[in-house]
Amino acid sequence: MKDPADLRFLLTIHDSPSLLAAARKLGLTPSAVTQRLQQLERHLGVRLVERSSRQLRFTDEGDMLCARGATLIGQFDALLDDLHQRRGGFVGKLRINAPFGFGRRHIAGCVAAFQQLHPEVDIALTLSDQPLVELTERFDVVIHIGRLGVSNLIAHAIAPNARFVCAAPSFVAQHGLPDDPAALAALPCIALRENNEDVTLWQFNKGRTRQSVRVAPKLSCNDGEVIRGWGVAGRGVIVRSEWDVARDLASGALVRLLPAWKLPDANVVALTHQRTGLPLRIRVFLDYLKTQFRPLPPWRRPG
């Protein structure tokens, strides 16, 4: 395999759920993709993909080629970026993933502004709340909020983000203010289902004191905007990120409960596949993103 384009072609197939999806990304017909893949296999003398009518399954040799090839392509792109930097610019594609709500409110505008500053960079922003493991290989930068599980990704700090227990004033008028986390177990609570986490165990600390409470949600949803809306409507107690409810707290649409007790933070980070050797366009985007959230993120700015 002498042409990097062949390796990029194979990596596109590897990162696609089906042959049809790969064909769409490549701008080719499925038959053309199959034909080129067969030519590549004949040239290498090894089977790379087991094909069926419904799915693709890479062989061990195909997986090895893609794993090591992705590293080589990354190094090659970084080299080209450095050459462009010497000429005073950079080009290429930038694939970014962000959660739905945060992406709409805080990332989409940053992406559009960055592209306007650097018109030679093509940017594809994907909003998704899929589990992180399903996303990593498809994107150059993944915006992540909260605790990061076992991962080989590199986290770049973007912004601080606390989590609050909240309820609507109408809910507080009916049920009163809880004076201890344990009191939440007897109140109607609303849970956000995401990433296969235990969403009914809420953990608090006050100084060195730690307390966990198991809530029994009367309502749950996998969409944060729905959760916030239910909370504002007085349907129950919610736990939401500071970035999501800061305006509601400021306007009085929500009231913060148990302010003396702290939930684990859910800071905003940008994840990349490596710390060093990143292509210039990724490094510059990360620097730009940090400037948009510092010295204070939008949800902590006055007014």
Regions found by a protein language model. Name each.
Residues 91-151, 302:
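Central regulatory/effector-binding core of bacterial HTH transcription factors
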Residues 41-58, 254:
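A short LG(V/I)-centered, amphipathic sequence patch enriched
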Residues 67, 120, 242-251, 261-303:
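C-terminal effector-binding regulatory domain of bacterial HTH transcription factors
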Residues 212-256, 263, 272:
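Hydrophobic hinge/microswitch elements
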Residues 152-163, 167-192, 207:
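Flexible hinge/capping segments at coil-to-helix
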Residues 12-27:
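Short helix-boundary/capping micro-motifs
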Residues 29, 36, 110:
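Residues within the DNA-recognition helix of helix-turn-helix
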